[in-house]
Structure formats: C-alpha cells, structure tokens
C-alpha cells in the first residue's frame, strides 16, 4: 500500500502542484484547504504524513501542530511558510513540526525532506526496500546510490532528481513542462535547453560502458524511460 500524505494549503495552485508531484512519485495524496478541515480528515482517517502551510484561514498550521501534539499524535509534519526567518522556524518547530521548508521551494527538496521524515518513522528494513529498478538500472532514494548493472554511477542532485522522476514512471511519456516543474520547482526556466542538457548528461553516464539507451526522446512532447525507442 502506498504512503498516504495529507497536503494542507489554502492556495489551490500550491495544493494541486504538490498533489501532482507527490502522486508522480508514488504517494497517495489527499487535500485540505485549511486547518479545521485537516483535523477532521486526520481524525476520521489518519494519513502517514502531513504537509502543512502556516498561514491559513480559520485555523493556521501552527495551531494544527499544537493540537495534534497535545493529543500525543506523532504524525510526521512538514511545515511550509512564506516567511523564512529564524523566529518563524523556531515557532514552527516549537509547535511540534518535524521539519520546515520556506516558500518558494524546489519540489526536489520537498520530496527529499518527505523521504527523510518517513525514514525516521519507519523501521530500517522498510527503508532499505525503497530501491527503484528498471531493466539493469537501479536507483536508491535512501542511500542516493545509482547503478547500471554492477557499475556505480555518480550523479549531481539535479541529475539524480531527473532520473528518479523517470524511473518512478517507467514507460510513461513525461512532458517537458511536467519534468521542469517537478525537478526545477515552481520557478522553472520557461526557455533555454536546461532539460535537454541534463538528459544528455544522464545518457552519457548511464551509457558510459556501451549499455543500450533507456532514456528516449518523444519528439515534441518530452521523454520516456523504456527499453526500446518509442
């Protein structure tokens, strides 16, 4: 069963962006638009983790944290806020949040922080089983190790995030805009060839010993991870 995450934010665009990104990475996602709705949903069907905005109507994120912790609930909580100051971070952590991420943020970082939160609440054997595989390509989001057969591949953060998205969606064509939004975040470049450059980097590294190509271009659309060209 996939991990269930409740996303709570009064900004619909943020909610939908997080829903798409988390769903693409294998999570089951539910949405709430404020703290009152979030607490009701948690009480009726507790999720595995919570992504929680601070500034919301009716009941803000910090009060949601306080109420949950006040009942002894240890639900993993990642707090989002538009204010990036020491006092704001301290307030969030003191209210009971496990981690803190200022807006705007790269979706890659949010996904990494969510994995870290879930690792801290799962037994070691569960964390060790998170390796993703396609053909002879293996990517482990916990250890951040990548292998092609027995060959270890060293990747930068952006290369890793791009490959992780592709391997999480095998044989599924991913549009250029979808990849840019998820890997580069909300402020992704709308022009230039950054994506093409990084796809080239990944191809060179994953094919360095003459292995067959796995990352294919779908002309006019985007890219796909598959054994043969589309």
Curated annotation (Swiss-Prot):
Q: What is the effect of changing residue 53 to A?
A: No loss of phosphorylation
What InterPro entries has UniProt attached to this entry?
CheY-like_superfamily, OmpR/PhoB-type_DNA-bd, Sig_transdc_resp-reg_receiver, WalR-like, WH-like_DNA-bd_sf
Posttranslational modification? Phosphorylated and dephosphorylated by MprB.
Q: What induces it?
A: Autoregulated. Differentially up-regulated under different stress conditions, such as low concentrations of detergents and alkaline pH. Induced by low concentrations of sodium dodecyl sulfate (SDS) in a SigE-dependent manner. In strain ATCC 25618 / H37Rv, repressed during growth in macrophages.
A biological process (GO) of this protein is: negative regulation of DNA-templated transcription
Can you give the residue ranges of the Response regulatory domain? 4-118
Q: Gene3D superfamilies given for it?
A: 3.40.50.2300, 6.10.250.690, Winged helix-like DNA-binding domain superfamily/Winged helix DNA-binding domain (1.10.10.10)
Keywords attached to this Swiss-Prot or TrEMBL record, sorted alphabetically, are: Activator, Cytoplasm, DNA-binding, Phosphoprotein, Repressor, Stress response, Transcription, Transcription regulation, Two-component regulatory system, Virulence
Q: Which SUPFAM superfamilies is this protein grouped with?
A: CheY-like
Which Pfam families would you find in this protein's record? Response_reg, Trans_reg_C
Assembly and partners are described as: Monomer. Interaction with each conserved 8-bp repeat requires tandem binding by two protein monomers.
Role of this protein = Member of the two-component regulatory system MprB/MprA which contributes to maintaining a balance among several systems involved in stress resistance and is required for establishment and maintenance of persistent infection in the host. Functions as a transcriptional regulator that recognizes a 19-bp nucleotide motif comprizing two loosely conserved 8-bp direct DNA-binding motif repeats separated by a 3-bp spacer region.
Write down what this protein is called.
Response regulator MprA
């Amino acid at each position: 069963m996939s991990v269930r995450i409740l996303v709570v934010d009064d900004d619909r665009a943020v909610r939908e962006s997080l829903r798409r990104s988390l769903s693409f990475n294998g999570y089951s996602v539910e949405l709430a638009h404020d703290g009152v709705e979030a607490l009701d949903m948690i009480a009726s069907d507790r999720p595995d983790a919570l992504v929680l905005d601070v500034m919301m109507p009716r009941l803000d994120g910090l009060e949601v944290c306080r109420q949950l912790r006040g009942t002894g609930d240890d639900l993993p909580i990642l707090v989002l806020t538009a204010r990036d100051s020491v006092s704001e971070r301290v307030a969030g952590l003191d209210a009971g949040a496990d981690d803190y991420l200022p807006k705007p943020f790269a979706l890659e970082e949010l996904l990494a922080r969510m994995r870290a939160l879930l690792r801290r609440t799962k037994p070691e054997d569960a964390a060790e089983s998170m390796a993703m595989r396609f053909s002879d390509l293996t990517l482990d989001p916990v250890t951040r190790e990548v292998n092609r057969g027995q060959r270890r591949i060293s990747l930068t953060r952006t290369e890793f995030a791009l490959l992780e998205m592709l391997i999480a969606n095998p044989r599924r064509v991913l549009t250029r805009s979808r990849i840019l939004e998820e890997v580069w975040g909300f402020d992704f470049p709308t022009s230039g060839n950054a994506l093409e450059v990084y796809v080239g980097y990944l191809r060179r590294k994953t094919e360095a010993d003459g292995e067959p190509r796995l990352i294919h271009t779908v002309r006019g659309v985007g890219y796909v991870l598959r054994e043969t060209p589309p």
